[in-house]
Amino acid sequence: MASAARGESSNPYGGGLGTGGKFRKPTARRSQKTPYDRPTTSVRNAGLGGGDVRGGGWLSKLVDPAQRLITYSAQRLFGSLSRKRLGSGETPLQSPEQQKQLPERGVNQETKVGHKEDVSNLSMKNGLIRMEDTNASVDPPKDGFTDLEKILQGKTFTRSEVDRLTTLLRSKAADSSTMNEEQRNEVGMVVRHPPSHERDRTHPDNGSMNTLVSTPPGSLRTLDECIASPAQLAKAYMGSRPSEVTPSMLGLRGQAGREDSVFLNRTPFPQKSPTMSLVTKPSGQRPLENGFVTPRSRGRSAVYSMARTPYSRPQSSVKIGSLFQASPSKWEESLPSGSRQGFQSGLKRRSSVLDNDIGSVGPVRRIRQKSNLSSRSLALPVSESPLSVRANGGEKTTHTSKDSAEDIPGSSFNLVPTKSSEMASKILQQLDKLVSTREKSPSKLSPSMLRGPALKSLQNVEAPKFLGNLPEKKANSPDSSYQKQEISRESVSREVLAQSEKTGDAVDGTSKTGSSKDQDMRGKGVYMPLTNSLEEHPPKKRSFRMSAHEDFLELDDDLGAASTPCEVAEKQNAFEVEKSHISMPIGEKPLTPSEAMPSTSYISNGDASQGTSNGSLETERNKFVAFPIEAVQQSNMASEPTSKFIQGTEKSSISSGKPTSEEKRIPLEEPKKPAAVFPNISFSPPATGLLNQNSGASADIKLEKTSSTAFGVSEAWAKPTESKKTFSNSASGAESSTSAAPTLNGSIFSAGANAVTPPPSNGSLTSSPSFPPSISNIPSDNSVGDMPSTVQSFAATHNSSSIFGKLPTSNDSNSQSTSASPLSSTSPFKFGQPAAPFSAPAVSESSGQISKETEVKNATFGNTSTFKFGGMASADQSTGIVFGAKSAENKSRPGFVFGSSSVVGGSTLNPSTAAASAPESSGSLIFGVTSSSTPGTETSKISASSAATNTGNSVFGTSSFAFTSSGSSMVGGVSASTGSSVFGFNAVSSASATSSQSQASNLFGAGNAQTGNTGSGTTTSTQSIPFQFGSSPSAPSFGLSGNSSLASNSSPFGFSKSEPAVFTSVSTPQLSSTNSSASSSSTMSSPLFGTSWQAPNSSPNSGPVFSSSFTTSSTPTTFSFGGSSAATVSSTTTPIFGASTNNTPSPSPIFGFGSTPPTTPQQPVFGNSGTPSQSLFGNSTPGFAFGAPNNGNGINNNQQVSMEDSMAEDTDQANRASMVAPMFGQAAVSMPQPNFAFGGGAATQPPSMANPFQFGGQPMASTLQNASPFQASQSLEFQGGGSFSLGSTGGGDKSGRRIFKAKKSTRKK
């Protein structure tokens, strides 16, 4: 047995494990396969080869049967005897040279440092009492068994342990002749330390414990250090392929921290042959604490170091393994302590694995990191950090230099050639220059599609595009690193931010020379430092990156000055830079510092704006023009530039923040400026400041004609002028005199070409307020002659912007003093292409005369009379577009137009003389389609608001802007406040000198903007009610004097029309006519679901369809599904299915369940003339004709009964003219009796008809106030028990509640 065992041990691979019986075991023990299994033949050949050295190959074939017998018997019967027999044959310990050649399976799974005891421990398979010499070249000295005996004496193996060891060893079986360090590295699994007492007992004094430290690099120490897990091997293999990953795929996405930490330390390592070791073998450092070298993150949870793609973190010696030495911890050890500290601080936002660019081929999610934090804190010297780099098994200490850091000719990073990138950038730039505005593709990616960090990252990404043609400089100092570039870029951005604050600093004493110097300083001094800082950029051209620069304070989300990044980006693009070869022709004259630059993020194409002979600017290109919004100029700025065309030349006059009646205009010559391209839509405080109406501030923002198309759709110009747009939040104060008319046709998502007439050469552009960054733009050329600032009423130009629709183009006509801007309204979701040029008359405030008839020309696709799906219909005065039906009446306009917006030309109403009754104003259409009904009313874009006197709300309209073309101008005249749209993105209320206040509440009552107009001073109160179901109207502005009429219009789904129309919420002809300045009337129409209250108005209110708004004179009641009780001075129409008590002559609702009857003749339901004839369903004088205007008293139901105390709560008793009978109601009775209406209001006027659905109600002989909603009215319904009305509102007193208690007693009777 001893000789057999010795023979077996002399041939470990051939007979013992490989050939004899191990692979011939039963399948139950062979079932466990691993990727490291070797063929049986190879093991057999290895055994034979080993036998040739030791002479034991033949013995393995002979003892195979005996081996099986010994295997089982030793385990079961002869365990103790086996240990004793080991002592008979003792082999000496193997020398380090022998250990160097230990095959893989000789390495015990329990060894961490490769002791011979572990090899012997593994070699004892199944408790077999034999010693395996682990290498064929090792002679069997007699000390080997002593070693094994000591191990076996210290430990007894159970069968389960033996089986486990057998399985492990079988999985590790390999060809001893082909075994090398590579295979050792591959096969090395997670190694367990043997018990310390066993190690000490095994090698007490032979010094073999120190062999690991003293062995040369090729020794077992290298094996142990480089033991890799299977996952690491797979990753190393994937990373070893030379042309696999490019820098863009490696996740080198421009994070400064990663680039500073990695690329400043990389050196041109030679390409290694594919046959070299897959896992790097560091030589000079201490061994790892654990046996595996899988990269791990420091200080972060394991989630951040998890593989985000199947092949992430490709770490290999070919790519970056030689630099990072298979582990970030080992690489950090080679760094100086200061560098390591900075490096770790730079990596605190992300794992070291990702930040070292070891992995993340394709990130699934974007991790926000503070790039500048890592770049600033990274104290890694470029040329002073010796990295212990081992290439090809040797130890090299290479000092990385700046040259090698930026240009790595021999590295495996397949960098994009610099020349090709430069050439590509130049070609793109030339193409951008050549492309004209008319030829832009509508599918361009515009920054308007981006928000927040993505838009900011786009700005940073564009820098190589403009600076890509700059030669890469190889600096000798680390200052030229990308870290420095980021810092300098940030500093330059702050510098520009500081200088952009000087934009409005120029005052009347500004001279051309001073402005020239200042502008040169801005054009060169600001942009050039940025250029210099970006000259030495990393060698790779980065792709579009979405990383948010959290440390860029000026680019952060809570941006203090929204215009700053825009101006910075613009100045980078709009000015010619000497070192970047982007040729951007500029006019001979430098830009004035007061110039309002468009807030364009990047001008991707060089623009040469050519000045035409008439002083208009020809924009040759307008690429990526989407929402071209100027940098927000707040109206309270020190000075706001206004551009004026004086004698055909473009001048900019600077109006101080406190304009006087006589404002001096200092013309400063301006160069031809490129069109605003790549506009930023910044919703920062200045942008949101649009809601802040600065009354005294001048709205003098230079606005130039711009076609803004959402998706790059360029708009055709009759005479294209430069695209400049300010989004200034300055609703004009009463005093703003100078103004620049915005000549902007902004179409949002509009694919149509807009024909905007060039500004006439005769005068300065009048100012018109910019609107919130919501989709509204302000298009229209006003040629307003230089009018004295005393004339407060300017023609407030308004945007014609369509959503998904063509823009109506407006041609302004010249007027003697002030020309009303063309009333161009756009309909959202308009797929037609209406370009309706029309000139609006200009009315001076004092004269009140209409300078010119407005002529409205319909666009090609959308005709006035046709219901275009997006067509824009324009009527001469007010035309309702009801499914394409053209109502040519000047007065009423049916509302239900799905996407068409009707533009009403016509003379503008004189703001000062409110006696001139503006025809009814039409409210908003269905989806915010704007319809301007009155001549002199201008509708805002998405939310329909009649500009002259009322504002309508669109359901999804962003903000409704009310502007009368002449009547309510920025400066003076009736300013229509804009109600907020349904989701009320921005409700803008413009305060004007004349006292007219209109409020529109949107469907879900997002924001209500209300303009307070005082006769002397303008006070604007802007109230926004976010997501309120049923917007409550904001209180009238403080200090209303003279004509103070509160007109608010809320349309259920954007419907609003002057006349009640079925399926269209009514729009009261708000401010339609106020006879005297003393007359104060407020009109409110409730939204679809009857949540807003209606305030009484001098003109009739028409209730919305299917809803009723409880309209008391003063207090609103919201969330009322019942009918609306309108205690209004003149007349109010109740909603269709909502009964309301109307104290004034008004049409009754169609299906009003208990509205009070009128005594005056009203139109029948289906459009019959208003005679007190019984209505369609058996009730007299029904209120609604389907789409037909109700002609009540006054001009188209403009009941101009003015009451000073119309806002009082007792307005029910104010004007008791007539009552409206409900549709299904009974005949009228002279006594007022509240209806049994679900929401029906109690009628309080003496002449009234009997209430329908009356349950034994006895008429009261006295006039009673309307009961509050859900309360019994004073009328004797239910025999005095009180009306069961679900929402009638009236002036109702406390007595109604007491009567309601009598209801129970009535039932008992």
UniProtKB/Swiss-Prot annotation:
Q: Where is the composition biased (Polar residues)?
A: 91-101, 268-283, 597-617, 635-659, 789-803
State the UniProt keywords alphabetically: Cytoplasm, mRNA transport, Nuclear pore complex, Nucleus, Protein transport, Repeat, Translocation, Transport
User: Which portions of the chain have biased composition (kind: Gly residues)?
Assistant: 47-58, 1279-1293
What is the protein's major site of localization?
nucleus
Q: Where in the cell is it found?
A: Nucleus envelope; Nucleus, Nuclear pore complex; Cytoplasm, Cytosol
* sequence repeat locations: 711-712, 804-805, 831-832, 861-862, 869-870, 883-884, 898-899, 927-928, 956-957, 983-984, 1004-1005, 1029-1030, 1038-1039, 1053-1054, 1089-1090, 1121-1122, 1137-1138, 1151-1152, 1153-1154, 1166-1167, 1177-1178, 1186-1187, 1224-1225, 1238-1239, 1255-1256
Compositional bias per record (Basic residues), positions renumbered to this chain: 22-32, 1297-1309
Q: Which GO terms describe its cellular component?
A: cytosol; nuclear envelope; nuclear periphery; nuclear pore
What do we know about how this protein assembles, alone or with others? Part of the nuclear pore complex (NPC). The NPC has an eight-fold symmetrical structure comprising a central transport channel and two rings, the cytoplasmic and nuclear rings, to which eight filaments are attached. The cytoplasmic filaments have loose ends, while the nuclear filaments are joined in a distal ring, forming a nuclear basket. NPCs are highly dynamic in configuration and composition, and can be devided in 3 subcomplexes, the NUP62 subcomplex, the NUP107-160 subcomplex and the NUP93 subcomplex, containing approximately 30 different nucleoporin proteins.
| Protein name, as recorded | Nuclear pore complex protein NUP1
The species this protein belongs to is Arabidopsis thaliana
Q: What is the lineage of its organism?
A: Eukaryota, Viridiplantae, Streptophyta, Embryophyta, Tracheophyta
Gene name linked to the record: NUP1
